[in-house]
Amino acid sequence: MAPTGKRTGESTRSTGPAPPSSAGYLDGRLLIAMPVMGDARFERSVIYLCAHSAEGAMGIIVNHPAGSIDFPELLEQLGIIRKGEHIKLPENAESMKVLRGGPVDTGRGFVLHSSDFYIENATLRIDDGVCLTATVDILRAIANGSGPKHAILALGYAGWAPGQLETEIQSNGWLHCDADADLIFGDDVDEKYGRALRKIGIDPGMLSNEAGHA
């Protein structure tokens, strides 16, 4: 799960509020893209940081729908359910959105979920309320109703080389704020960007390329 130090976009293998660590690391917090970011892949992105250290950073975009596929269709493609069996899925599975998690490893699924579900040697506990699992076992569990209470599925992730995220933050490319369950797992993905900004006292309508960083 941990980043391996390649630049964003390169292929690699790799809640309660979480304040920045004493070393300034932001894992467990949300990044909010600023207009000066200049990278269309991250425009108006809200990213939950799963890992951040001297080795780099890794996160999941939580507000950009994948658009081309829904969760029941993905389960069919993986052979977890047969065609037409979506009517038997639990309500939270049938309506679960598939998100575009970032430009790295876009063919791989990453599930951010509440900490009531855990697979030994497969689940990364990020903080007391949020975990990350990237195996098909969690998809099977969600499909049969034994999965976590809250979850989102993202295809791909965002990754940063050592020091890259810090440089982008210093250049006003990102703001950051406390994460909460609604901003991570909420269904209103189109509203998350504005809500994250308002959480740190910024009116989205007043945001400009000259905005400073918090």
From Swiss-Prot:
Residues 1-22 are annotated as: Disordered. This is UPF0301 protein blr1492. Gene3D superfamilies: VC0467-like. It holds the Pfam family DUF179. Belongs to the UPF0301 (AlgH) family. One of its GO terms (cellular component) is cytosol. NCBIfam families: PRK00228.1-4. It comes from Bradyrhizobium diazoefficiens (strain JCM 10833 / BCRC 13528 / IAM 13628 / NBRC 14792 / USDA 110).
